[in-house]
Amino acid sequence: VGGLDIAGLTGFYLGAAACGLPIVLDGVISCTAALAAVRLCPLVADYLIAAHCSEEPASALLLQELGKKAFLTAGMHLGEGTGAAAGIALLDLALAPYKEMPTFDEIGVEAYKPLK
């Protein structure tokens, strides 16, 4: 059972993976489409990021079948991409030091010298 929304997302995921773009999953519909895409092309799984596991029982089953573990579990079942939005914000927060901190060279820290 499914609709054109799942078919459309499946095609979108296949295209995103073909272009080397990450795919952030959110909820049962997006995970169902992801599973369909993985069944068509197993390499798609390498591009999937499970933002959260919703309260819907099917969510955990789909993530298990995809071999993915969500990094955010907050008991959410709001819909409309809220889990993915929260997940992306958390990823941005985690990447901020990597992207914004200067290197040792940029701040004049000398290279490590072993003690003798």
Predicted regions: what they are:
Residues 1-116:
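N-terminal loops that bind phosphate or other acidic moieties
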